[in-house]
């Protein structure tokens, strides 16, 4: 097994700024995982981008009175700024309206088509009677015909987990305007999932390490596999590269067909932009490489069924066989890591209903790491979780400020005041050895949790060590030792021990709190970049594509991407010995305490009772 890890992160729609519910599901968990893997020595490739096709963008563009391209350009830039500000360490965060993405998507489609896994059928398509526009499956809701649950979507019922078609729903209505959709006959290309069922089942049944809810849901999908439409009656999207279809401006590829291909196209673009066009193959063609996919629970289907099926069919590994195409044998996901929903006042975040906290506003007032901490320790890892300002304030004040911030501040302050540097320790007592051993053992405990995407378990144990370190200082009472010259060696030993544990805890918390970790690194008298920050880079869409493809965008558009030189950072998953004699400076406050009243009212821009 090599040590290359692909971290594929769900693509956010470019139809509005991101709110904290979005980043709780796909953003922070994936970054914690990627940062830990890099610190452990893995060669990580973390990719994503803005999803700029599909009806959601058309609907929003209509609302704002702008073209879809204008809308996508604006929100692509806003989302890039949001995610970079949060410290998400993408090797490449790009977009789906690039020449490269069009070409790669069309290559995947043609491979599936030539292998017989894209079939033409006449289906019943839903359209809006008032606009004539196609309604996506997810924009139609009704009663599930199988279990009777209300609120079932046109693609699946979350209550029973069964796949549906919009025409299956009882009393279907459009989520856009509440009208009853009209169903018309239309011809589409469908992914022949039944022909790939055995291959999908064989792959899924080997996924022993997945979160139980994700694996159970994915296995249930196999029970009623039907061909699924991969084209849509829509004028905004990627053209269908088949004779007789490619010039039809009213039919495009389904947004979810092209979005999941984005993990591959982004990897190819990353390789080009870093000067080694073949480098992507190390993560995609080498079966020893691993790939982890992060998303919210509503997107499991596309990552544990649709995307693996596309990959299997492209390589001719279904019942119809077929050949391997130009991109070679491509790796299927090692694990699909899904989070539940972050809610507010018991409801899903909704901009239209005013139930929303935007990332941009949150970062401006509180910075990135308090939000990252909250999502890690109290977020929707395994269950839907309600965000409240009261809990946010309580956790920041009691855990981050009083716990971690206090440990760093008082340890470094006492060492600086009494020695001006990291002191030389004397003989260690059993108490010293115990806390040092606890901190060292935590690398294994927290590392094991992070390697298996158990982020809440990992940060809980790391903060337990912080608590043990604070208890150690309270027990040793170095402020009393400082008043007795005969206890100077013991004072030096206690403070050296505490500084070492601070250093250890900083390593443990780095994947979660990279911005604070850099501050602590400097507070301990160390130079250089400990935890690298992502950078926003303006690029030009000038990438050569072969084959050219159908209807691809013209070269020359410029757009922002997120990249970063993470290989140059010093952070590693191991004890970093504190060196006696290292100069210290008076520490600055690490984490500002919040006004408790904020927990009752919320900030002006997101009040508790709007």
UniProtKB/Swiss-Prot annotation:
Annotated disulfide bonds: none
EC number, UniProt record: 6.1.1.10
Keywords, sorted A to Z: Aminoacyl-tRNA synthetase, ATP-binding, Cytoplasm, Ligase, Metal-binding, Nucleotide-binding, Protein biosynthesis, Zinc
Alphabetical list of Pfam families matching this protein: Anticodon_1 (PF08264), tRNA-synt_1g (PF09334)
Top-rank taxon, per record: Bacteria
Binding site for Zn(2+): 144, 147, 157, 160
A single GO molecular function term of this UniProt record: metal ion binding
CDD domains per UniProt: Anticodon_Ia_Met (cd07957)
Any one Gene Ontology BP term: methionyl-tRNA aminoacylation
Motif ('KMSKS' region): 348-352
Binding annotation for ATP: 351
GO cellular component terms, A-Z: cytosol
Entry's localization field: Cytoplasm
Function: Is required not only for elongation of protein synthesis but also for the initiation of all mRNA translation through initiator tRNA(fMet) aminoacylation.
Subunit comment: Monomer.
NCBIfam families xref list: metG
Identification of the protein by name: Methionine--tRNA ligase
Organism: Corynebacterium diphtheriae (strain ATCC 700971 / NCTC 13129 / Biotype gravis)
């Amino acid at each position: 097994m090599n040590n290359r890890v692909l971290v594929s992160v769900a693509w956010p729609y470019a139809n509005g700024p991101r709110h904290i519910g979005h980043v709780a599901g796909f953003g922070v968990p994936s970054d914690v995982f990627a940062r830990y893997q890099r610190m452990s020595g893995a060669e990580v490739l973390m990719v994503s981008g803005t999803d700029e096709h599909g009806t959601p963008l058309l609907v929003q563009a209509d609302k704002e009175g702008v073209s879809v391209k204008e809308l996508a350009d604006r929100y692509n830039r806003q989302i890039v700024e949001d995610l970079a500000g949060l410290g998400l360490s993408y090797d490449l965060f790009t977009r789906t309206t690039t020449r490269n993405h069009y070409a790669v998507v069309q290559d995947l489609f043609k491979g599936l088509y030539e292998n017989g896994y894209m079939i033409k059928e006449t289906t019943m398509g839903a359209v809006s009677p008032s606009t004539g526009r196609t309604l996506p499956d997810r924009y139609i809701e009704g009663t599930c015909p199988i279990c009777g649950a209300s609120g079932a979507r046109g693609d699946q019922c979350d209550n029973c987990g069964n796949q549906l078609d919009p025409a299956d729903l009882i009393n279907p209505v459009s989520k856009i305007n509440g009208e009853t959709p009209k169903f018309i006959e239309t011809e589409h290309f469908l992914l022949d999932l039944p022909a790939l069922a055995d291959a999908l089942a064989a792959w899924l049944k080997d996924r022993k390490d997945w979160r139980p809810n994700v694996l159970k849901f994915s296995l249930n999908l196999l029970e009623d596999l039907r061909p699924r439409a991969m084209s849509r009656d829509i004028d905004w999207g990627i053209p269908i590269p088949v004779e007789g279809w490619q010039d039809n401006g009213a039919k495009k590829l389904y947004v979810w067909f092209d979005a999941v291909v984005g993990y591959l196209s982004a990897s190819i673009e990353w390789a080009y932009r870093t000067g080694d066009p073949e480098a992507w193959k190390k993560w995609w063609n080498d079966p020893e490489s691993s790939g982890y996919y992060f998303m919210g629970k509503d997107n499991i289907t596309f990552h544990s069924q649709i995307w693996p099926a596309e990959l299997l069919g492209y390589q001719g590994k279904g019942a119809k066989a077929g050949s391997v195409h130009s991109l070679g044998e491509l790796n299927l996901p090692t694990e699909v890591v899904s989070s539940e929903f972050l809610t507010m006042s018991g409801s899903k975040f909704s901009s239209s209903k005013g139930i929303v906290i935007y990332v941009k506003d949150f970062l401006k007032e509180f910075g990135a790491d308090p939000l990252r901490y909250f999502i890690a320790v109290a977020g929707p890892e395994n269950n839907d979780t309600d965000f409240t300002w009261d809990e946010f304030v309580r956790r920041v004040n009691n855990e981050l400020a009083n716990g971690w911030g206090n440990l760093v501040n008082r340890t470094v302050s006492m060492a600086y005041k009494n020695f001006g540097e990291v002191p030389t320790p004397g003989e260690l007592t059993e108490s010293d050895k115990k806390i040092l051993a606890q901190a060292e053992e935590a690398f294994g405990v927290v590392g094991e949790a992070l390697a298996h995407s158990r982020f809440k378990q990992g940060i809980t144990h790391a903060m337990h060590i912080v608590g043990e370190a604070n208890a150690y200082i309270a027990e040793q009472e170095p402020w009393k030792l400082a008043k007795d010259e005969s206890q100077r060696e013991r004072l030096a030993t206690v403070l050296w021990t505490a500084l070492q544990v601070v250093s250890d805890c900083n390593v443990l918390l780095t994947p979660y709190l990279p911005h604070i970790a850099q501050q602590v690194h400097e507070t301990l008298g160390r130079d250089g970049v400990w935890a690298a920050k992502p950078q926003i880079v303006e690029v030009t869409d000038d990438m050569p594509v072969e084959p050219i493809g159908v209807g691809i965008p013209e070269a020359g558009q410029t757009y922002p991407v997120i990249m970063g030189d993470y290989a140059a950072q010093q952070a590693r998953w191991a004890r970093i010995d504190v060196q006696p004699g290292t100069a210290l400076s008076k520490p600055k406050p690490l984490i500002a305490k919040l006004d408790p009243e904020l927990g009752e009212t919320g900030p002006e821009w997101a009040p508790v009772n709007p």
